[in-house]
UniProtKB/Swiss-Prot annotation:
Gene that specifies this protein: MDM34
Function (record text): Component of the ERMES/MDM complex, which serves as a molecular tether to connect the endoplasmic reticulum (ER) and mitochondria. Components of this complex are involved in the control of mitochondrial shape and protein biogenesis, and function in nonvesicular lipid trafficking between the ER and mitochondria. MDM34 is required for the interaction of the ER-resident membrane protein MMM1 and the outer mitochondrial membrane-resident beta-barrel protein MDM10.
Family to which the UniProt record says this protein belongs: Belongs to the MDM34 family.
One Gene Ontology cellular component: ERMES complex
Official protein name in the record: Mitochondrial distribution and morphology protein 34
Organism superkingdom: Eukaryota
Membrane topology: Multi-pass membrane protein
Gene Ontology molecular-function annotations: lipid binding
Keyword Repressor included in the entry's annotation: no
Length: 543
């Protein structure tokens, strides 16, 4: 759906005068910048002969008192607008108008230079013409009989605009004005035009007269939107003296003097390095200042890099204050260490741990005694292990659990057969009697041979209960009574030896027995206690 707009009906004096008045009030609203020497006036306004093209793309809601739709507008006509104002061409005049020289001229006479004609106005007239406007945009229109017309653009409708001014000969100024005016017109379509159309629509939708609509529109446009935010702030608890000091500080930054006046309790930026040095004085001065002590004569005039501990202060002060002085020194050193850099690490303190060597020694001993079977169980528990090889119980303590060291794997060999016991021989009487167990007559394999430990009264046994489990000395065989099944052909040599020993001991003394044994060992036939055995068969003479 499209419409043909009767554009010639807009060429009326009443509409033109009302539009000029409305735009003049809008352009001069708010605080005027110092670069402008006069107000902005509209010199020429012409709507042109070419009407814009208006097309409705969609109608969302249609009623007697309500309408909502999407439209498209295209304009490439001959509309033009000419503005007139005066521009301040003296930069020193602009600088003096922006400064606070008038408020502080009494205290600071030389804030800005006072050359001849330096602060006089130099106004240049400026004519600004806007023409060749090209618009192409899509917007949304919402019309209500009670609320008027509302229009919002979905995109930036401004395609191009031509800006002509008095300064077109200066290319830099021409480019600057072109960019600034394009940005302002885009803001006009985005914010100002919807508000303006809404106010105009109320003229036809309400019973109020035109003057009331214009007055309401003037009140809306006369609001100081671009006013300084500091003007709306309420200054509280600021005396006139403080305001004068603040103005003096502000003016000191604008002066052309080589010697900037110094102000009390104020740090200048060029003196900031000296101020930072005073923030970190030496240890002695900080100590005297914090504790309220009189300065020691030995440390007067010491440089700020000297941070040694004042031993003279500790020696001269009372013994009761020495502890407080040492605590203050520690706090000052900690603050200086932390303020040195953000990547600081906590200071290391000397600590002494007692009993660490003993605990480490116990852990090492337990690790040596552990086997690979104990190293598998890593849980916090107590384990006892007993074997035929050792009766040592291994207990995993809390210290071992916290710091576990894997021992070297040990090869465990378990003998399935218990070791042989030491052979115990019964000491008999030294004689070559065939009745003796050591005689050659019973030396062969058979009964009475000491190899089977039968003659000594000790039967062979493979039971592990008789082994020495505690590592003590082995028990002698004659102290252990073992019941041995006796054979019918067995000769009890021990009883015979006891009888022989008893017979010798009853009739003779120890010396006689010693002599007899000696004679017997030398084969003395005179003192032979009993008959000698016959010689072996290989020693007999052959007949």
């Amino acid at each position: 759906m499209s419409f043909n707009v009767n554009w010639n009906s807009l060429e009326t004096d009443s509409l033109r005068s009302w539009t000029v008045e409305l735009l003049t009030e809008a352009l001069n609203s708010g605080k005027r910048p110092n670069i402008l020497a006069s107000d902005i006036t509209i010199k020429d306004l012409n709507f042109g002969k070419i009407a814009p093209r208006f097309e409705i793309l969609e109608i969302g809601e249609l009623d007697r008192d309500r309408f909502r739709g999407i439209f498209k507008i295209d304009y490439n006509g001959d509309f033009h607008l000419t503005l007139h104002t005066k521009v301040q061409a003296n930069p020193l005049k602009i600088y003096s108008d922006n400064s606070l020289e008038k408020e502080i001229s009494a205290s600071s006479p030389f804030v800005t230079p006072d050359f001849l004609l330096s602060s006089d106005a130099f106004n240049i007239p400026l004519d600004l013409k806007l023409s060749d406007i090209k618009i192409s945009g899509i917007g949304i229109i919402v019309f209500s009989k009670s609320k008027g017309l509302t229009m919002v653009f979905r995109n930036d409708p401004l395609d191009s605009i031509k800006v002509s001014s008095t300064f077109d000969t200066v290319q830099v100024l021409a480019t600057f004005l072109q960019n600034q005016i394009e940005n302002q017109i885009r803001d006009l379509f985005r914010e100002t035009l919807p508000t303006l159309l809404h106010k105009v629509s109320l003229k036809y939708t309400s019973s109020n007269n035109t003057n009331d609509i214009i007055d309401n529109l003037k009140d809306h446009l006369s609001n100081n939107v671009y006013s300084n935010a500091l003007e709306s702030l309420e200054v509280e608890n600021v005396s006139p003296g403080n305001l004068q000091k603040l103005a003096k500080i502000y003016s000191s930054r604008e002066t052309l003097k080589l010697n900037v006046p110094k102000l009390k309790r104020i740090v200048q930026r060029n003196h900031l390095e000296k101020f930072n040095k005073n923030l970190n004085p030496n240890l002695a001065s900080c100590l005297y200042t914090n504790m309220g002590l009189q300065e020691y004569s030995g440390f007067s005039g010491v440089s700020s890099s000297y941070n040694s501990i004042p031993v003279g202060l500790i020696a001269n002060e009372d013994f009761k204050k020495v502890d407080e002085i040492l605590q203050e020194i520690s706090s000052i050193q900690s603050k200086n260490f932390k303020s040195g850099s953000n990547d600081h690490k906590p200071a290391k303190r000397r600590t002494i741990k007692l009993g660490k060597g003993m605990r480490q020694k116990k852990v090492d001993m337990q690790n040596v005694d552990e086997s690979t079977l104990n190293s598998i169980n890593m849980s916090r528990c107590a384990t006892e292990y007993c074997d035929t090889l050792s009766d040592v119980s291994t207990v995993l303590s809390d210290d071992q659990h916290n710091h576990i060291e894997q021992p070297t794997p040990l090869k465990v060999f378990t003998d399935t057969r218990p070791p042989l016991r030491n052979v115990v021989y019964t000491e008999g009487y030294k004689c070559s009697s065939p009745m003796n167990s050591n005689s050659s007559f019973v030396g062969s394999v058979g009964l009475g041979n000491n190899f089977f430990q039968i003659a000594s009264g000790c039967a062979p046994s493979a039971s592990p209960l008789r082994n020495d489990l505690s590592g003590q000395k082995s028990v002698h065989s004659h102290d252990v009574k073992v019941k041995v099944k006796k054979s019918m052909n067995r000769i009890d040599v021990s009883q015979i030896n006891e009888k022989l020993n008893g017979g010798f001991n009853n009739g003779t003394s120890k010396e006689a027995m010693h002599n007899e044994n000696k004679a017997f060992s030398h084969n003395d036939p005179s003192i032979t206690p009993f008959e000698l055995p016959p010689p072996p068969y290989h020693q007999l003479s052959r007949a």
